[in-house]
């Protein structure tokens, strides 16, 4: 397998496959076909087969795919056995909602801390997550070996905060602002613009 050849679209589908395969495994299913995955995930069967082909000849004609083998493969690829330390920067409405969502209690992400400038929030514990002053980012991130940051600050602060995170050694940033931020080549950015996602959904509805 050559990770450099895996498309971004395929990479984003891998967690969906992993979750679906986990559910099938829990139900005692030994095998699954691309047609079944199409029905369960609403992903075209040809796309499923193409995605899986990145990892070699995983299936057999007339049999399908071995659920446990796929599950072990994606568990390794997605590093499910290794939890990444995550920090949320900006504990406004969205940041607070992400903390309360508690996704850090499952999967391979663990929210260790949050940062904000609001004195009413700084120094509090939000759903077991301590909130620190944003000026402590560099020291806290280094000390706690934070690898990933979720950015939910105002657009005007996005680049400044990103620079602090990069200086602290952050390797990945999930950017919920609409600002296009600059980072070094060795830092991965994943932009999440909810307004664009909504526009894409409405467009897709019109095509049906």
From Swiss-Prot:
The GO terms describing molecular function are: DNA binding; DNA-binding transcription factor activity
**Gene3D superfamilies assigned to the protein according to its UniProt record, in alphabetical order:** NAD(P)-binding Rossmann-like Domain, Winged helix-like DNA-binding domain superfamily/Winged helix DNA-binding domain
Q: Which GO terms describe its cellular component?
A: cytoplasm
- A family per Pfam: Put_DNA-bind_N
Cellular compartment(s): Cytoplasm
Q: Which residues bind NAD(+)?
A: 90-95
List the InterPro entries hit by this protein, alphabetically: CoA-bd, NAD(P)-bd_dom_sf, Rex_DNA-bd_C_dom, Tscrpt_rep_Rex, WH-like_DNA-bd_sf, WH_DNA-bd_sf
Q: Which residues bind DNA?
A: 16-55
Keyword NAD attributed: yes
Q: What SMART domains does the entry give?
A: CoA_binding
Entry keyword set? Cytoplasm, DNA-binding, NAD, Repressor, Transcription, Transcription regulation
Give a yes or no for keyword Transcription regulation in this entry: yes
Q: What is its main location?
A: cytoplasm
Q: Which SUPFAM superfamilies match?
A: NAD(P)-binding Rossmann-fold domains, Winged helix' DNA-binding domain
> What domain of life does the native source organism fall in?
Bacteria
Question: What does the record list as GO biological process?
Answer: negative regulation of DNA-templated transcription; response to redox state
Q: Which HAMAP family match?
A: Rex (MF_01131)
Task: Spell out the family assignment given in the record's similarity comment.
Answer: Belongs to the transcriptional regulatory Rex family.
Quaternary organization: Homodimer.
Cross-referenced PANTHER family, in alphabetical order?
A: REDOX-SENSING TRANSCRIPTIONAL REPRESSOR REX (PTHR35786), REDOX-SENSING TRANSCRIPTIONAL REPRESSOR REX 1 (PTHR35786:SF1)
NCBIfam families, from UniProt?
Answer: PRK05472.1-3, PRK05472.1-5, PRK05472.2-3, PRK05472.2-4, PRK05472.2-5
Function noted in UniProt: Modulates transcription in response to changes in cellular NADH/NAD(+) redox state.
Q: What is the official name of this protein in its record?
A: Redox-sensing transcriptional repressor Rex
